[in-house]
Amino acid sequence: MAIREKVFNTIISCFKRHGAEVIDTPVFELKETLMGKYGEDSKLIYDLKDQGGELLSLRYDLTVPFARYLAMNKITNIKRYHIAKVYRRDNPAMTRGRYREFYQCDFDIAGHFDPMIPDAECLKIVHEILSMLQLGDFLIKINDRRILNGMFAVCGIPDSLFHSTCSTVDKLNKATWEDVKNEMVGEKGLLPEAADRIGEYVRLHAGGLGLIEQLLQDPKLSQNKLAREGLGDMKLLFEYLTLFGIADKISFDLSLARGLDYYTGVIYEAILLQPQNARREEPVNMGSVAGGGRYDELVGMFDPKGRKVPCVGVSIGIERIFSIMEQEVEASKEKIRTTETQVLVATPQKNFLDVRLNLISELWDSGIKAEMLYKKNPKLLNQLQYCEDTGIPLAAIIGEQELKDGVVKLRVVASREEVDIPREKLAEEIRRRLES
């Protein structure tokens, strides 16, 4: 839990730095609220039935409930964050950070703004969080649903198959192109020639402005209105990312599809990279740790008059991050402190419980994080051992002589250095030592 608390604090501080306010939404929704929003992943939604026969579902993510919240409260402009549990009928795999109940950490910007400015800020937030958590090298892959849909159109894919084709392309990060093509042709009903044309495009990745310019010159793609719009916005986005100083960690990747039905524009996914070595020329993808995109039409689905509120957001894959950090701590044999206690109030005397209670109360009232052992007459050795076992850096020791002299013996646990401090200055001295 200490690692989790550190990660949560890091993420929340970043969200607040960018001006977000926190909101909360219910753990369960009407089933009809969630259906039709997640494509093929809808089968992973947990269904509930209450005593009156009403069909409910546990929330699958934090995005759809947020959109319903905006529509219900007629909110047209907000920057929010939300950290809460979501639920999926998935196959759990703890080593890969996959669970049926897990936390998501979401940041979203809702409102009518000039193109790509909020989108760029969301990517900047992902960059900041992954940099602060020091998880190693990472890459943020981006694409646009308009470019994908334009690509499908020029490849001869019927409109009715856009969503299912998108879900299949989304599997390219886990499967080979041959497997993906076989699914397109065998299960989705695409012609082999159409699948091959898609293959030519989705193999174009690891690009930036150069790839955007190349696609703008593509004789087929450049004639498609949706694709042109998406490429124009992608070019603008890269200009903003360059100004933010993060373009070197961004890759325009046509194979990125993100299968959720509600995305309408830019989509992105952050992956951790395993460093290259003598046997590997390329860094290896260790899995996704964040994802998100633009969803301009989702709020309108819940508004009685169909009023749209453009939104863009990102979700941090916190469970996978926990899993990685816990493995690193285990491998390093590093001892993690589970509390923030600054000082243990101790005594070598018997029958000094009242003195300890009085002193610890003074420290608590002064804002010092303090503990004591819950025994009337603990041995001093046991008290100091507790400090070492739990990583408490200081011990405030008070005995008969210290009580008579109006001082407290402050002991640095690591060095065993001891110094007498006037009792009224004890809290101030503890702060000074810990700050230095």
Segment roles from a protein language model:
Residues A2-H18, E29-E32, L62-K74, I78-G136, ...:
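Positively charged, Gly/Ser-enriched RNA/tRNA-binding surfaces
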Residues I23, V27-L56, P92:
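Polyanion/phosphate-binding surface patch
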Residues I142-C155, D170-T176:
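Short, conserved secondary-structure transition motifs
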Residues G39-E40, V154-I157, V412:
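Short secondary-structure boundary/capping segments
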Residues K43-G52, I157-V180:
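Acidic, His- and aromatic-enriched active-site or binding-groove loops in soluble protein domains
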Residues E29, M151-F152, G156-P158, I212:
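Active-site-proximal loop/short-helix segments
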